[in-house]
Amino acid sequence: MSATVRAVVPGGTDDLPEVGGVATDTPEYFCLLTRAGAALEAAAHAAGKPVRLSVIAVGDGDGEVPVPTDDAVALVHEVYRRPIDSLSQDEEDPNICWVHIVIPTTEGGFWIREFGVWAEPLEDDGEPVLYAYGNHAPFYKLKSVLGQATTHELSVPIIMSGTADVEIVVSEAGYASRLELLQIAGVVED
């Protein structure tokens, strides 16, 4: 299956932001497939191999919220990376799966303004590929200090369609949110 990354706009297009007083047809915060990600898909398809998405990284954008472009090959300023913790199927669209990381309370002391989904190289001696790149509403991730602590969950939608095989590698040491644990325990319904 081919994976395409897109922005999901809560509430549909009526909620699109105004930029400079003019309504836009794109959301302010979004994620897109990079050229390197598309090239990796094509090479994987030709080689009969899957694209393996395994890591999500976040960055502070070097103090600014970047505008994602498909020519990105790295984050502007990466501050944290983590193996993908979990994935879930979209409740409304079976062609969309969500990849998630949870940044735990023990990590922090940085701003999040950008993120990237990294794919493993096709060859053992290759370099990981920035598969998808997006921006993030500015969020300060606290580190557990003096009784204050936060976790932060980042979820990225991946749209599956039909030309390349995409695998999402979930860390064996994945992190479950409190809600997920309650759902597993049967205390909270879906």
Q: Language-model features: where?
A:
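A signal for long, low-complexity, Ser/Thr/Asn-enriched, surface-exposed stalk/shaft
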Residues: 176-190
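N-terminal assembly/attachment segments of tailed bacteriophage virion structural proteins
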Residues: 2-172, 189
